[in-house]
């Protein structure tokens, strides 16, 4: 893996290199991975305080800004059980952006959401993209991928079938499998 002009060989990666990579990246999982016994703000600040050894006051300031950014300024003291799925996922996104990563990995961030809540999460992700945040997103939201991504990789059974710019992929696919896939989901992209 080459990341930030630094080469990492995973078969001989050191603990120091892993730590360096972790400081530059953040993850948002499909099932939120929030601490159920912590408020939204505590979920965002936990990693800053424990892993990054940040002072609590500074972590709280950063955590509030991150929650504000995802539209949850009125939910600092709410527990996950008091939040909708979309709000929980936005807390997870706030937790990721609070670490000021160079890239955020999203693993199907809307797959566990009701269709009505999907839009609020995609809106936050669209805002991040517009601000220049680098994101690697595993998604089935093809309309979102088409409008937000600058590169699309289509995989099947762990193998890359096709890759290219968003425009090339959606408007001029090369592979028959890609063409068949796009025909099947055409209605979902409108």
Residue ranges and their predicted role:
Residues 163-164:
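ABC ATPase "signature
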Residues 2-26, 57, 172-173:
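ABC ATPase NBD coupling module
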Residues 78-81, 99, 131:
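Conserved signature/switch motifs of ABC ATPase nucleotide-binding domains
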Residues 104-107:
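Catalytic Walker B motif of ABC-type/P-loop ATPase nucleotide-binding domains
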Residues 38-46:
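Short coil-to-helix segment of the ABC ATPase nucleotide-binding domain corresponding to the Q-loop/switch region
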Residues 139-140:
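H-loop/switch region of ABC-family ATPase nucleotide-binding domains
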């Amino acid at each position: 893996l080459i990341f930030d002009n630094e080469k990492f060989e995973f078969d001989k990666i050191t603990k120091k290199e892993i730590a360096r990579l972790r400081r530059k990246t953040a993850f948002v999982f499909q099932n939120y991975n929030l601490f159920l016994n912590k408020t939204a703000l505590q979920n965002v600040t936990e990693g800053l305080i424990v892993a990054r050894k940040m002072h609590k006051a500074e972590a709280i300031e950063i955590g509030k800004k991150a929650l504000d950014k995802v539209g949850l300024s009125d939910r600092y003291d709410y527990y996950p059980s008091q939040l909708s799925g979309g709000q929980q996922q936005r807390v997870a996104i706030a937790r990721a952006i609070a670490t000021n990563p160079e890239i955020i990995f999203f693993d199907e961030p809307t797959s566990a959401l009701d269709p009505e809540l999907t839009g609020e999460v995609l809106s936050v992700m669209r805002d991040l993209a517009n601000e220049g945040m680098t994101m690697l997103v595993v998604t089935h939201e093809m309309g979102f991928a088409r409008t937000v991504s600058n590169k699309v990789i289509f995989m099947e059974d762990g193998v890359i079938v096709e890759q290219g710019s968003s425009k090339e992929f959606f408007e001029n696919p090369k592979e028959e499998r890609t063409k068949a896939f796009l025909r099947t989901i055409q209605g979902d992209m409108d």
